[in-house]
Structures are given as structure tokens and as C-alpha cells.
């Protein structure tokens, strides 16, 4: 029996929630010392072996929560931007928003290492300013192109390249220790992160998700032309701006906490849309998919390989082939991007 669109989305969300809980339990159970389910439950409530309690509550739990909120933020941000711009490639990392957040964050790191006054600016604040600055530049440069999705995408790619060059230059102005730390962060890493890193992203997700859900009905209408949505009493331009502001904020906060973890925002929305079998991208489902991707990649990066890899390395290995697939779609006659 074929489910109605919203029922299909609800079923996909339920499956994703169950999968997320299973992955989170596994992530908190594996490490230098494996933990069985009974030990894990006792440790979460602060009882049992002290070493296990410390490993679970002070080391694994903060990292798992950070992976979840960073992945969810990237997933929701990517789903929103792809839906608003009607382009499966229009994710914050491709458009240059993540690059803007990165150059601002690395700039703060570099100036802070030199003892400059800007170095006291918190990295999440710098990342937000950088992300919104990049978005404003994309909008300004894309104004003459009529804000069409494909034109904005090309502008974003060009801007991202320029911002990446600036970031690389900033690395050359830092000392060896600072440059190594920043370079590790730029690959997308959750190593040595804790509750302080997760809190700004968690707040951002808690604020943005209700806004996105409130705009959900209007957002689904964006797959139609503005002339048609006006007849339904929906201001398409205002809804797009509000949603893109939410997308930029989430992408910038996620970047500040985990670095520019590549391809999560790009992949999550498309996986969510296919899983739900609907025309639009369900943002909540995209967030769940993003959380699962980052958590699985982070767990594998610290347990499967002899050395602990940055999570961005694994997401890039998976995401790059998917990007090539999206680029090949027009040649197969499935519609231009």
C-alpha cells in the first residue's frame, strides 16, 4: 500500500530516530574499553565502575552529543538551502557559507595567537559573522543574475575558492603549533571537543527548528513559482529569506564546533527526500540523517583505524562520489541542475 506523503515522512522520521538511538548507543559503548549495555546504562546514571563512568559520561557522551547536534545542524542547513534554491548542489559547503565561517574562525585563531584584541572574540560568534558575511556577498554578487539557483551556485563556488585561499594564507602567518591545530580543525574534527563546543550549536538547533517547522507549510509551496504562491497568500520571497537565514546560522554554528565537515549538508537532504519519497526535503528528517552520518563517521574514525582520523576525512570519502553522481545526472537526462 502506498503511503500518503506526510505519512511517508512520519514513517521515515520514526525509522531515523530508532537508527539514531542505536548508533548513539553503539558509539558510547565502543572505545579503548568496550562497554556492554548494562554497564552503559549504569554509567549514564553515575553508578558502577569509576573508570567506566568517567569514560562514558566525561569522554564519550559529550562527543556523541556534539556529533549529533553538528550533524543535525549541517543536515537541516543543507536541506533548507537545497529546497529554497531548488538545486541538489546548493548546500552551505558548496555555496561558500562554510568557507566564510572557516576564514573568520581561523582569523580569530591567528590573531589570538599573536595576542591581538580580536582574538578574544568567541569562535562561534566569529563563525556566525563569517557565514553571514559570505551569504551577503553571494546575494550581492548574484543580484544581477536574478537570484537563480544555478547562478548563485556558481557565485558561491567562486567565493568559496577565494575564501579558502585566504584561510590558507592565514595558516602561513601562524606558528607551527597553532597552524597544526587550525589545519586539523579545517579537516572537520571532533577530537578534544566537549560540552562547551556543543552548547552554541545545541541552542542554535533548538531556536531554528521550531521556526523551520512553523514555516513548513509555506516552505513546501516554494517548489512552485512565486506567482502561484501569491494566490495562496504566501510571500515566497520573505519565506526564502527567513529560511536561508536559518540555514546560514546553523551551518556557521556547526562549522564553529566541528570545523567545515564536508558533504554532510550536501548529502543529508537528498537522502531524506528519497527516504520519505516526497518532492520537497523534510528538514527534520534531513537533520536526523545528518546526525546519523556524522556520528557513524566519527565513531568509525576513532575505532576502526589504527590512528584517530578527522571525521571530515570519512565524510569526504563518502560524499565525493555522491557529488560526482549529482554532476552526472544531467548527462543521463534526469533534469538539469
Regions from the PLM with identified roles:
Residues 1-337:
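Alpha-helical transmembrane segments in inner-membrane proteins
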